């Protein structure tokens, strides 16, 4: 793990304290304690299982590893944690520019991968490059969905802001990949662009495009919640939490999406995963919103 810059250092500490982790990020037992804490949050929440995400390293278009990024969660570690904890479902991370990308994809499929996660703007992934076509085709053939970060990002370093636009997903969609646009393509800060309108245009064109509601109970991203609810396409939106991003009820109350009584009730829920689910149910998201992901994930 590498955290550079004052903003990321402050934010990482805010998130660590918000989720109740007593150990510093650099402590040798941090990973073990984090997994244990997350498992107990799942067990104590409305949610039965959680999609656990790996995080690949950053590569250039020639497949050379770049000295960029803040942390790396290997696929092997992901599979180990998921084997030991049935509450977790594995979403691997493979940069398609890696020299061994296809081999790693086949290996992860054989190991039971249910989805693949990337942050194109942070991991330098131009999804439109023709040299990645075979990677997308193999994902589509295997039924492995692509959970893709969309919109801005403030918790990890950004290498190319152009890749936060959901329109970069056109090529994987054309090749038949089921794509989940994380965060519903909303903006992450006041000066960031909201791409929700572009997301809806793509949804109208591609029935294999979905979006999730992860991190939408945060101060800025919550601004897209009303658009989601009024989109007329709720059947294409899936529940997500983006844990350990903190969850607050104040902003959705300020936007008129919940009542004062619901805001107070949410404040009594210390479990951030349960609080996030409670707020979405309070806003009117139905039971199917929380189970629809299982229909999209790869069957194993």
Spans of features found by a protein language model:
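An N-terminally biased module of ancient metal coordination in phosphate/nucleic-acid-related enzymes
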Residues: 1-53, 59, 63-69, 281-282, ...
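Active-site gating/metal-coordination segments in enzymes
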Residues: 49, 54-161
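Active-site neighborhood of phospho(di)ester-bond hydrolases with catalytic His/Asp-centered motifs
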Residues: 53, 91-93, 117, 147, ...
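Distinct, well-ordered alpha-helical segments
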Residues: 99-109, 128-133, 157-173, 189-203, ...
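Active-site core of metal-dependent hydrolases
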Residues: 118-120, 149-158, 178-188, 208-216
């Amino acid at each position: 793990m590498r955290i550079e810059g004052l903003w990321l250092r402050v934010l990482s500490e805010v998130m660590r304290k918000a989720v109740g982790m007593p150990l510093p990020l650099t402590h040798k037992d941090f990973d073990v304690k984090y997994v244990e804490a997350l498992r107990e949050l799942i067990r104590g929440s409305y949610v039965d299982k959680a999609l656990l995400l790996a995080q690949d390293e950053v590569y250039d278009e020639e497949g050379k590893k770049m000295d960029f990024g803040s942390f790396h969660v290997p696929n092997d570690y992901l599979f180990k944690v998921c084997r030991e904890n049935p509450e977790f479902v594995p979403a691997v991370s493979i940069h398609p520019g890696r020299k061994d990308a296809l081999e790693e994809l086949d290996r992860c499929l054989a190991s039971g991968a249910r989805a693949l996660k990337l942050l194109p703007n942070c991991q330098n992934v131009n999804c439109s490059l023709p040299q990645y076509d075979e990677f997308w085709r193999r994902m589509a053939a295997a039924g492995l969905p692509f959970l893709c970060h969309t919109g801005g990002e403030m918790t990890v370093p950004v290498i190319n802001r152009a890749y936060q636009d959901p329109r970069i997903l056109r090529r994987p969609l054309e090749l038949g990949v089921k794509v989940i646009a994380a965060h519903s393509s909303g903006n992450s800060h006041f000066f960031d662009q909201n791409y929700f309108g572009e997301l809806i245009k793509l949804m109208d064109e591609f029935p294999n495009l979905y979006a999730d509601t992860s991190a939408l109970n945060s101060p800025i991203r919550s601004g897209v919640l009303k658009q989601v609810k009024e989109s007329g396409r709720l059947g294409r939106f899936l529940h997500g939490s983006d844990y350990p991003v903190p969850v607050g009820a104040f902003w959705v109350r300020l936007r008129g999406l919940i009542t004062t009584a619901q805001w107070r009730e949410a404040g009594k829920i210390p479990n951030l995963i349960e609080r996030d689910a409670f707020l979405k149910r309070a806003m009117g998201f139905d039971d199917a919103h929380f189970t629809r992901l299982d229909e999209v994930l790869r069957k194993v």
